[in-house]
Amino acid sequence: TGVAGTRLYFVDCYIDGTTDFIFGPSTALFENCEIRSKTNSYVTAASTPKDIAVGYVFKNCRLTADPGVDKVYLGRPWRPYAATVFINCEMGKHIRPEGWHNWGNAENEKTARYAEYGSTGEGSPTADRVKWAKQLTKKEATLYDDLSYIYKMCSDWKSAK
């Protein structure tokens, strides 16, 4: 998804792939998209720079899968400080109960910035989510309604307001 400092906005899109099919260091908002997993693997592999607060934001998206796909993680950190958040997303039964993976490195659990709010669907229960990922409060989730908040740290972003 580009290079660090890149800002992207995907709306009403269909995106599918196999392993880490949404990856990189950019700040990207995915809104009202269908995100379809074609194999048992990982949806995201963010490599968000430490000094960028927001990486991938999925709002009001549907996470679906091909038939037979039943073990998919929301993400794993390509680099320390990976940032990915899912807000009000419908998660299919293919999403693993733990949600997130540390890419085989426990140190990533100290730096990865993973969060959810308002997830629905068979893959949404949070009781078995990894303890190092966050469940946002309504107030925290509301911050992501503001494009200035999402993109303010990217290159020359200036709000139109």
Residue ranges and their predicted role:
Residues 1-161:
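Sequence-level preference for short, compositionally simple segments enriched
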